[in-house]
């Protein structure tokens, strides 16, 4: 085991502080509408240019082990804020730096770090409550577009596309971000329920030019198991043929004799039919088949439920207005399920989303929810080069997360103004002693820092701007994009309340942890072994030029 280097007290905190400063100083130049770019070298390919705080933070590794510890802790603030709120990473980093910087000075002057932490916690709690009072719900598509625009570094195209996507698939809908083939950034909306399984044989297509199978008013047979034998399916097929309606078969698989018979009947024109594999795997497949059954008003033919395929009747089949099946996807439009049953299914999935601790499961459950409730919107991000594509895709994902946060908890004035506006509530915080009061003072000073930095990045003096904003009321603040003081909500400079809240809570949490650090331990750097002496030339090796 390698020997360790141990540093204590002020020395430990100072070295951690140097790392915090290095990371925060690199990240904070990106803040605001006039934020600067950061160029990041890549080990292969072109360097990346970004204005995304979390992308900058992720790239930073420092040589000094203790400084690196400080930097990594603040990196955690940025990542955590990005994961939960989708934006506010730079704000969180700046707040963490400001809280820690002020706190280190006070601890060095003899204040009790635990009491300072208690003061910080009390102040943050009061501010979070006040942010809730300041927040307003998002009223319309225009406000959603404004949130998206600001989070995407003032790109109105991105803001408008996200707002349009939300209006089309609803607040519960799934919006995914993909890379486009061309230069344009476009929105594609899939209405109804879509899943990523296509037809099992190209002979099922009804439009050979587009290679799709389209059916109006089809019946839908949902079978949990594999179908190989035709005799099991014959009774229900005969009933469907008498009704002269198209049939969609969704099963674990259809192969052998069953598939061949369906294809032959389709080609002869006896039966309009298409067979599709069931989506998902294992337990998720069962759940998705139940979703399809609920949406279409059918039943899952499952031996577990006591229904065998040979006993199935038309009453067990689902109905839909239209179904479109291509090589890779199946879309069910306007299923005939009962609204009460659909509502109950939605309620059940929502409860599962609340209970699950796995991010992957949560994402899959949200996708299922969206497929039942609304639909799926895909934002195809286009750009001229791959470097620009990556940067733009990052911005779209940030903006999308920020708009979701705005819809969830409402909006507050942007540009760092909301936190400054909440400052007055700190007068009512009752600290138990002077050291706790010092913790409250740290927060009072730290919450001005994002506004100061936005102003500084735009080429203004932060302190002057901050004082002017403090004199105003409500949404009055500084619009760094225009250099004007105005009503920020009316001007569209708005932030999601959730972003401000999460940024403040995460920053205070990590800064308090660092403040109460009394000892830091890291591996000692390894001494380089002395280089081996250079080998002298080997004599007598001349004259070998003729060898090939």
Swiss-Prot record:
ATP binds at residues 30-33, 51, 87-91, 415, 479-481, 495. One of its GO terms (biological process) is protein refolding. GO terms for cellular component: cytoplasm. It is found in: Cytoplasm. It comes from the Bacteria. It catalyses: ATP + H2O + a folded polypeptide = ADP + phosphate + an unfolded polypeptide. PROSITE patterns: CHAPERONINS_CPN60. It holds the Pfam family Cpn60_TCP1. Its EC number is 5.6.1.7. GO terms for molecular function: ATP binding; ATP-dependent protein folding chaperone; isomerase activity; unfolded protein binding. Belongs to the chaperonin (HSP60) family. Forms a cylinder of 14 subunits composed of two heptameric rings stacked back-to-back. Interacts with the co-chaperonin GroES. PANTHER family: 60 KDA HEAT SHOCK PROTEIN, MITOCHONDRIAL (PTHR45633). Together with its co-chaperonin GroES, plays an essential role in assisting protein folding. The GroEL-GroES system forms a nano-cage that allows encapsulation of the non-native substrate proteins and provides a physical environment optimized to promote and accelerate protein folding. This is Chaperonin GroEL. The lineage of its organism: Bacteria, Pseudomonadati, Thermodesulfobacteriota, Desulfovibrionia, Desulfovibrionales.
